[in-house]
């Protein structure tokens, strides 16, 4: 009888040890502390905190790979956030905005991911489909518009007030234009800026309008021409867009597209350039001024932290320049106008404390008129019907009623040369 009891006790102990070992394989362990700092006798394996925390395994879906500056910004943030939190992760790159996105999400679920993030606007319907099919998994989507109306508890949208960064980039551009005017390189009425947009979506319009308002804040005589590539990433079309704008007399260029096509063309033609998503100083040392980007690491850390703690993730999350979700690269002093760093610091402080509003309706007109009211299509039901009043207190309230931009207005001073 005693022998039988001893055998049973041994089996129970073995099973207990196996259970502890299993929980450690599901949750990547933090770097082990030196033996002298954590003696085994003082911290038994069965009492390790890692065994008590829910395991998070993250899966990420990217439209392109590291060659796209847009996707590289997300990839770097994903790695940073996961490594900071000690989260195991899988990356899927080159996933088109189609059924392939759903397939990639389903594969990540099969591989044990309970947090899945996709980075491109067109991924949304397919990621939402996956969220409905796998309710035990949390799905987060950058730049999307449907979470706040879809009513799917495990589906979430996120964005950041990148228009603040675009405005700062515009300020840097305006300073450069003023320098060119003062030096006699151009006259005040030749202060024409070019902008290469991917698509004529609200996200892109919000970006180039905020950039232009930053330019005008410093250089009141500036005008801007916009051309579209109808692709998020096409080095050839982006280069051709830059060539077209330069041939039309644009003396400074910016973009909302994802390759080095335009920056390299600007460098070849000695045209100053404000970039997006990362620095181009190494490739374009003579013309790159500065760039803005969304820092996605804070959101990813927040969302994965919610999964780990079993807490709800915000349906619509918006980061700001004050929360370091919007960042500027280092200024390239070789190309920037003198005093750019000091001016950007001054304007950044004003944006953070709210004394300066990017979309202050007193700073722009539409067909010669100041806007006092405007209905925007915030509740994206697929019908493109505006329903939400977005002007209040003399400001177009961007990214307040949902995280993704909905500024889709054509303001005076900007010309779409493709129209």
Language model features with spans:
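Short, low-complexity patches enriched in S/T/P/G
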Residues: 1, 23-24
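C-terminal motif of bacterial Sec signal peptides marking the signal peptidase cleavage site
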Residues: 16-19
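Positively charged n-region of N-terminal signal peptides that target proteins for export
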Residues: 1-9
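A residue-level marker of the well-folded mature domains of exported/periplasmic proteins
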Residues: 24-30, 34-419
